[in-house]
Amino acid sequence: MPVKPIVRPIPGAVTRPGRKPRWLSLAAGLAAVAAGVACLAAGSASAAPARAARPGTAGGAGAAVFRALSCGPPDYFIQCYSPGQYQVAYGVAPLLRRGITGKGEVVVMPELANRPGPDFTDIRTDLAAFDRKFGLPAAKLKVTTTLAGASAPYVAGTEEVEDTEIVHAIAPGASLDVVLVPANATTSAANFTAAVAGTIRAAISQHAAVVSISGSHGEHFFAPAQVARLHVALRQAAEHHVTVVASSGDTGVISDSGPPKQVSLPASDPLVLGAGGTALNASTVTGAYLGEMTWNTDTEASAGGYSTLFPRPAYQNGVGRVGRMRGVPDVAADADASTAMALTFAGGILYPAQGTSAATPLWAAVVALADQDAGHRLGFVNPAIYAIARGPAYHRAFHDVTTGDNSVFWPTRLFTGYTAGPGWDPATGWGSPNAQVLVPLLAHQTRPGGIVHS
């Protein structure tokens, strides 16, 4: 598919220190905190000037919300929204007021069995601090050690904190199950595949509603047998009415290991709801939604494009910019550190969420809300998502992201990506949720007792 070239200056954008190839994308995020990059939470003093807007923004999606602190490069600010502002921006607040909180639903998240060290903390302590800081109910957290071994140590890095706190902020009544996977899950495609398949088995055995996977690798990383094993596991999830949401990745049109252009698994599998990234602009006072654009820092961006492994699924038939092959992502949400939700780490330090691994648990939480509203687990939601998006309620149920692109530099060469536009696009999918409309529609669109086939 022809792509309009994007003209961009030489990259000079600052990204969070220590970003790693995708499985648990924020594992080195404490380096940023230790460097003094932090954000203040609700009730902070006067707002600081926003970072310069990227070309094409209207007022900048990174409008200041709280006064930002930085010991990093001059004039670089990290700005954060509170969970309450996120709830308003994405239409969750009205659902919470009527008791749709995710109560009774279980969201499963695979996380590495981290070894204790200076870059890790206790997730229970962090969740408790998060709840106190932002007035949330106590989180219901379980840690499953089956895959990593009963004696596996568990301490949280910033990725684990991000996954759990975002789900808890959006679906505060849902139960959180952290499934520990072996620390070597990042080292090979075989180990990654085993970790994902094992997590899905654990979710099925616990009758979980949703699996939220923040890890990804480019399709070229996997052998055919591993792709097949992943697909079998995902089919089992669908058969047991478990929704799987996965991050599309943080490297635009290339994979985490660099060129060539490719999309990433598991998000590219048609049985997965793939989540891309945006930069959110919301009211600094009320949290009211003002707009979004494609997340892009020039060296990191919302990953998206077209699969080389999976043909176009039936639910994407007739979608204008999808050709013969599966298009990714399906949906998107905030992934930009300069427009992020504040997270609590190390018992009280606040830092910004970042990456499509922030969008993924948000969408997992939205599905959990819809599960509760429906009174049953929705399972494979992609056909319902596409049916709603292609119907008359699209612009009420979704925020259509129509500006920006996912071109990236690697390391100094520009890889031209895809522009966002009206409707579905390979930068932000259908866009981000307006949950107060989308959740009831999802609850109505799906049916209990069987798969809505692709």
PLM feature spans:
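Short acidic, Gly/Pro-enriched loop/turn segments at secondary-structure junctions
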Residues: 281-287
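Ser/Thr/Gly/Pro-rich low-complexity, disordered linker/stalk segments of secreted
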Residues: 451-454
